[in-house]
């Protein structure tokens, strides 16, 4: 049987943190096992890196990413799609700071991606600012050799007003030379805080999907852009101590073949997608593992 070596690198890192990581106190009071400075790499050309050693909440991955892309910071919009992964953050943020109304997460990812530099007032307001996503798409189409295609979520001016400052902070996109009539789009993500149990599997899938979407909408009649690699740099790599039992089970599982992804909506407008446009094929994961989110 072929071993899924790409998922195996994630499992190897889990094992390293579990058995070699140092014990640390943390903001949540739960405690963690920690290592610092690791990297994973996934080939997006023929498969999609949705982990198989536990079932990953695919609907949540897609809807959260589309919510980020829309620029929304209103958790009720995500709730309407049946996704409640930000609800506890919203409740805690409102209780502790009460800066905005209860469903408002502050100037988190979507706001930074689409309205960078604007003064955040609330989730119901209209904003201008720098549309980083559209700038990246335009650059891919017009100057694919450019080395400044960066998507930034980290904003020191705004971090204190966010329900949670960005864990995945900076994504750098790179376009290859033309090979066999097409170019490849790769993404390198820097993640300052990497929760190996809950966050990282989600983040891998999310930025792999974002790379697929940007490649899709950046393609033109004369220039085909396809996904290349996803490189994931993890800075503070940690496992919460209340996740150890579940993750010990996960590393005992033999990874299966990754699924594939098809985008069936042929439009080139990044704001015009729905979750139905992304078809995941041949996803055969092990059962989900229960882990509580640390706040």
Swiss-Prot record:
- Which Gene3D superfamilies does the record associate with it? Thymidylate synthase/dCMP hydroxymethylase domain
The highest taxon in the source lineage is Viruses
Give the EC number(s) under which this enzyme is classified. Answer: 2.1.1.45
Q: What residues bind dUMP, as annotated?
A: 27, 147-148, 192-195, 203, 238-240
Chain sites annotated for binding (6R)-5,10-methylene-5,6,7,8-tetrahydrofolate:
195, 294
Q: Please state the pathway this protein functions in, per its UniProt record.
A: Pyrimidine metabolism; dTTP biosynthesis
Provide the GO MF annotations for this entry.
Answer: thymidylate synthase activity
Please give the catalytic activity noted in the UniProt record: dUMP + (6R)-5,10-methylene-5,6,7,8-tetrahydrofolate = 7,8-dihydrofolate + dTMP
Q: Does the keyword Methyltransferase apply?
A: yes
Q: Where is the active site?
A: 167
Keyword annotations for this protein, in alphabetical order, are:
Methyltransferase, Nucleotide biosynthesis, Transferase
UniProt-listed CDD domains: TS_Pyrimidine_HMase
- Enzyme class, spelled out: transferase
Q: Which residues form a coiled coil?
A: none
Which GO biological process entries does UniProt record here? dTMP biosynthetic process; dTTP biosynthetic process; methylation
Entries under Pfam families matching the protein = Thymidylat_synt
Extract the NCBIfam families matched here. Answer: thym_sym (TIGR03284)
The family assignment reads: Belongs to the thymidylate synthase family.
- What is the name attached to this protein's record? Probable thymidylate synthase 225R
Q: Which organism is it from?
A: Invertebrate iridescent virus 6
